[in-house]
């Protein structure tokens, strides 16, 4: 079991180091065998006492904040970048952005009021130190997929494993 960004996980899959991966990011579905594990809310998070907590935030108000985000290659980051791009923006539109590869450190910095972030609800579910906010179209529901190489017996094995 390993946690890493989408690009690294796919490289490990192709290198035979992993049998299957669970991806929350964007990948080439024509290149791999995949099936939907579940749909997961992708949300904005902030410190619990932040003015955004519990609100729907207009995009232009977000840009005055420090954005704390995952490293390039991360599925979580790719989703945010794609949604921003569709609205004509990049992460550079934010007052500042900090790139961190650890969800644990991102959680800590956001809970301390150092900035806002976007990630899957499961990362902070039932944790009272965080406020949640929405900012359509940046937030919404996205797929979590089980991904493996084509033409192997792994899809059936992965399904059985996940049914346990």
List each language-model region with its residue ranges:
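Short beta-strand-to-loop elements that line the ligand-binding cleft
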Residues: 1-4, 24-25, 91-102
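Hydrophobic residues within well-ordered alpha-helices
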Residues: 13-14, 62, 107-113, 146
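Flexible hinge/capping segments at coil-to-helix
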Residues: 32-68, 72
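A ligand-binding cleft/hinge motif common to bilobed small-molecule-binding domains
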Residues: 25-32, 103-133
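Short loop/turn segments at beta->alpha junctions
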Residues: 5, 58, 101-102, 120
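Secondary-structure junction motif
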Residues: 67-88, 155
């Amino acid at each position: 079991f390993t946690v890493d960004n989408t690009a690294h996980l796919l490289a490990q899959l192709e290198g035979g180091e992993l049998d299957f991966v669970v991806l929350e990011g964007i990948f080439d579905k024509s290149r791999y065998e995949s099936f939907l594990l579940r749909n997961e809310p992708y949300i904005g998070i902030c410190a619990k006492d932040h003015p955004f907590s519990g609100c729907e935030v207009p995009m232009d108000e977000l840009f005055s904040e420090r954005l704390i985000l995952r490293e390039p290659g991360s599925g979580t980051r790719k989703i945010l970048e794609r949604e921003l791009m569709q609205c004509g923006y990049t992460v550079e539109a934010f007052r500042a952005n900090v790139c961190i590869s650890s969800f644990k450190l991102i959680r800590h910095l956001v809970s301390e009021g150092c900035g806002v972030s976007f990630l899957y609800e499961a990362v902070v579910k039932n944790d009272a130190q965080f406020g949640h906010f929405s900012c359509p179209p940046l937030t919404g529901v996205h797929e979590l997929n089980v991904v493996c190489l084509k033409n192997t017996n792994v899809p059936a094995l992965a399904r059985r494993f996940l049914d346990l």
